[in-house]
Amino acid sequence: EVAQRAPRVVFCLLTALRLHDLTTQLPHEVWIAIGNKEHPPRMSYPRLRTVRFSTASLAAGVETREVEGARLRVTGVPKTVADCFKFRSKVGLGVALEAVRETIRGRRATIDEVWRYARVDRVQKVLRPYLEALA
């Protein structure tokens, strides 16, 4: 429903983790990303949690998926992991750690792919020790 009423939004963070089967968390809200200067869509249901991305960050690592007949723009696996570290104060460090662990151990993305998006999100210093531990 969100994708139909707001086709420009990108599903991210906990919603993207759930779509990629990378978390045990069940988000109570739909997490969406919008550009810095965009207005968030107004919807009474489902509840939306909006985060703002820079133009470069919003364009990087977005893929289109077909879910229940709707075309969704979703952040890819390595981009979602980097975003979780960027917004770790919102999603929690535990969620970010679970995401990077499941991604690397499950071979859903390589360390280099995650690192590329960490550079886009400017979280290399935060993410480096965790990636080194998993290497």
Regions found by a protein language model. Name each.
Residues 1-135:
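Nucleic-acid-binding surface
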